[in-house]
Amino acid sequence: MLRLQPAPVSPTPALESNGTAPRPSLELSRVQFIQQEFASFLTGFDSSQAVVRIDRFHWIHDRLFIDGWSPEQISQALRATEIRGRFIAVSSGKGGVGKTTVALNLALAFAQCGRRTLLFDGDLGMANVHVYAGLNPAVTVLDVLDRRVALSDAVVSGPAGLKLICGASGVARLASLDRRQLEELNGQLCRLATQYDVVVLDTGAGIGREVLSLLTLADEIVVVATPNLASTLDAYGLIKAGYEARILGSFGILANLAKDQAEARVVVERLTTCAARFLQMSVRNLGWLPRAPRVEAANQSRRSVLESSPSSDFAKRLRTIAAGFLPGCGSHTSSAASKQESAAA
């Protein structure tokens, strides 16, 4: 794994109020640019890690202004040094496409195959992961942003060892966080991710600042789209916005609520063709999930489909999709699934 060698700092300059220690020769404009452009890599350190933060600041400065690296190259290198879990974002251009259902069941599939998994509800102002998971959290992201608790204190336990961080619902100000708040939240997520093998991000729908901010963390981005034409168009809009924002994660299409494979194929082909033609982007086909009464029944009963109907076609296809990200996660045996279903009955 790539290791960054911080620029030597001797003697260590006095800390500024914001925790950085720019060298006397640094231009103020450069300091401000680094603080704004790389905020997610400079936040989340406690007081005992101040020197680490200083070293990182100087390393960024030297790569940027001495070695001529681009901001994208620096961000990629910094991400490579983070010993953290793999970030998989589940997003959509339009609401009502089953995004949260996919995120919850995908995260649970990872947890069921033994991966340390965290599910983060990133639909900050209109969160509902906790509803589908059957949880009533005492602490949410709202408490974190109001500085009442640390992000790690907002983690709650779900089924199969799955851990979740729940959002708040109906809190308008969470849907309009400023850049500093979003960068601080991202920084805390990166620190917390060192304790997990995979972090699933259930983003909000659309292309708002909150959505794109979370997508900057993602190694892979699952774009959920349905056969509905508006959903397909909005899914392309999300991919295009990610391209224009220079999101580095790999995009993939998951066709949801399809009546059969042929209908799902149309969705995937439309999106992959448009991305290749107009954006010169290669977008993966992640598979498809059927429209099924059991899915809605599971949501209404506040349980995941993998718990309530583990042998269903939806559950089997979901595990296959999970195995595409983490090999071995599709091997949750049919016998184990049958036992769960029998117990539920």
Segments (PLM) and residue ranges:
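Extreme N-terminal, non-catalytic leader segments
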Residues: 1-18, 23-46, 50-94
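Walker A/P-loop phosphate-binding motif and the immediately C-terminal alpha-helix
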Residues: 80-123
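P-loop/Walker-type NTP enzyme "switch/lid" segment
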Residues: 92, 119-194, 269, 293-304
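Inter-motif core of Ras-like GTPase G domains
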Residues: 211-229
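G-domain G4 guanine-recognition motif of GTPases
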Residues: 226, 253-265, 288-295
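Conserved C-terminal guanine-recognition region of P-loop GTPase G domains, centered on the G4
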Residues: 236-246
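Beta-strand-loop-alpha "switch" segments that mediate conformational coupling across diverse proteins
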Residues: 277-306, 318
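NTP-binding/hydrolysis catalytic cores, primarily Walker-type P-loop NTPases
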Residues: 300-345
